[in-house]
Curated annotation (Swiss-Prot):
InterPro entries: Ribosomal_uS11, Ribosomal_uS11_bac-type, Ribosomal_uS11_sf. It holds the Pfam family Ribosomal_S11. This is Small ribosomal subunit protein uS11. GO terms for biological process: translation. GO terms for molecular function: rRNA binding; structural constituent of ribosome. Located on the platform of the 30S subunit, it bridges several disparate RNA helices of the 16S rRNA. Forms part of the Shine-Dalgarno cleft in the 70S ribosome.
Length: 129
């Protein structure tokens, strides 16, 4: 018997005017997720999904390319204004933020939501190069 043709599921176009951009910049990668006010994901991208591998993922340029990609996806849903939440110590924080502003979004607020331990887990060993 012939296989049933697999259906390609299209993203339905939502009309959301404003949202929250979560920029998570680690030492190895930068992920950017755009959500609505309730926290439902609308679009996401990362340096890894944009084709960067290894140490190139942690560069500011990779974060910029990922931010341009996610902004294109979010603007298809009619998004115009963003609140930006930046987390992590990585080098892609500022460049991702600049790329979001350059893509035509109105950034209403920028918050640093990096978690800081109150002397929690023991850190990993010192790196000797």
């Amino acid at each position: 018997m012939a296989k049933e043709a697999t259906r390609v599921r299209r993203r339905e176009r939502k009309n959301i005017a404003s949202g929250v951009a979560h920029v998570n910049s680690s030492f190895n990668n930068t992920t950017i997720t755009i959500t609505d006010a309730q926290g439902n994901t609308i679009a996401w991208s990362s340096a890894g999904t944009m084709g960067f591998k290894g140490s190139r993922k942690s560069t500011p340029y990779a974060a910029q390319v990922a931010a341009e990609d996610v902004s294109k996806k979010a603007q298809e849903h009619g998004m115009r204004t963003l609140e930006v939440e930046v987390a992590g110590p990585g080098s892609g924080r500022e460049s991702a933020l600049r790329a979001l502003q350059a893509a035509g979004f109105t950034v209403t607020s920028i918050r640093d939501v990096t978690t800081i331990p109150h002397n929690g887990c023991r850190p990993r060993k010192r790196r000797r190069v």
